Amino acid sequence: MCDTIVATPAYTKNGKMLFAKNSDRSPNEPQFLQHIPAKDYDLQKTPTLTLTYVAVPQVEHTFEITISRPSWMWGAEFGFNEFGLNIGNEAVFTKEKYVKTDGVTGMDMLRLALERCRSAKEALDFLTEFIEKYPQGGNCGYGKKFYYHNSFLIADSSDAYVLETAGKYWVWKKVKDFFAISNCLCLESYDACSAGLVENAIKNGWCKSKTDFNFVKCYTEPLFTKFAKGRERRVKAMELLGEGSPDVKKFISILRSHAGKAERGYQEVGSICMHAGGVIGDQTTASYVAEIDGADSVYFVTGASLPCISLFKPYVLGKNEHVAEDGEDKKGVGYWLTHEKMLRYFISGTLLTNEIIEKGRAAENEWIDRFLSATKEDRVAISEDAFEQDERLVLKQLDDARTKQISFTRGGAYYRIFWKNKTKKLYEFIKKENKEK
C-alpha cells in the first residue's frame, strides 16, 4: 500500500515540479536508499540483466540513479535519476489474472525506467511497451504472498503522467495541475490506451459496448480494492493538494497526515501516514519529497519508517556518507534498522514522542530552509550535516532507552500482540545481521 503525489510548475508556489511518495510495506521489511552510478556494459560479456525473478536484455549504458529499495528486491519503490526523472509506483488490484511466477515486478519496471530514460514521456513510452512484452507479476510480499498489478506516477521538471495498468493493458493521462495515486484505479478518462483494452472488457462481460466502457469500473477487482482503502487515501491527498500553491513543506505535511486519532498508536490502512497494527498490517517504511529542476533537482528523504516521527533530510543525487552505494546493501539495511529500533520504542509507548518530535522538527525546518536557499556547491555539505544531526538524535534516543524494555501499552489487545510479535522477529533479524558482519 502506498501513496504518490505530484504538483506541476503551473500549480506550485515557486513554479517547480513537486513529487512525493509514502511507501507502505511490511513493517519488518528493511527499505534503504541506494545510490548507483552511471555504468557502461559490454553486451558481448553481459547481454542480460537479472531482475528480481526474470532476466531481460541489458543496454549499453545506464544512468545515475538513487532509489529506495526493499532489501530483497532488485527494483525500487521510488527513485530518481541524473536528469531529474522521478517515478513512484502503486499496487492496484484488477480483474486480469496475476502472473505468480516469472513475472516482472512494478518495482523492477520502475528501476529499469530510471536507468534507461531521460524524460517523463520517454519513461511512459518505455513502460507501456515493456508491459506489453513482459508479463508483470511475481510475489511482491515480504514474508507473505502478495500479487498485484501497478500504476505509476512519472514526472520530470516540466511534465507529469499517470499510468495505470491491468496485466498487459494500460491507460495514461497527462497531469495538468496536481494528482494523487493510491491503491486503486482512478483514470475514468485518459489520453491514450493500449490496443484491445475495450474489446477485452466486452469479451469478459465487464461492459456491453464501447459507449458503456469505463476503465475503472470494468477493470477494478472490488474486494481487495475496498479493503486496501486506496480510494479514501487518494481523496484525502487530493483534498490537501487542492488547498493550493504547495511547497516542499506542504508536501511533507501531506505525507505525515493521519486519518485516525492522534493519540492512538494505530493509524488504519486509510491513513496516508500508515501505522501497522490492524488486520492489514502495512506501514509507511520510507518516504521522500522531490523538487524537480533537471540536474539541479533536490530531494528530502527519511530513509526510515513513519514520516510523522522520522525526519526528512535534504539530499542531492550523488555520494553521501549515510546513503548506501551499489553493493553496500548491508550498510543500507543497517541504517534502516538503527532508525527502526528507535521507532519501536515510540510505537510501543515506552518513550513519549511529543518532545522528541518538536526537537526534531525544529532541526528539520532549519536545514530545509538552509538547503533550499543555498548554492548548489553548499548543498552537499548541508545534506551531510542534516544526516549527521539526524543520526545523533536517533542514537541519543537509543542511548536514553537502553535501560528500558520495550513494553507495548498502547492500543487494543490485537495491536499490542501484533507489535510484540513483529518486534521479536525484528530483533531476531538484527541478531542474524550482526553475526553475518
Predicted stretch roles:
Residues 1-10, 263-272, 408:
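Short, Gly/Pro- and small/polar-rich lid/capping loops
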Residues 269-403:
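Substrate-recognition/cap regions that form aromatic- and gly/pro-loop-enriched pockets
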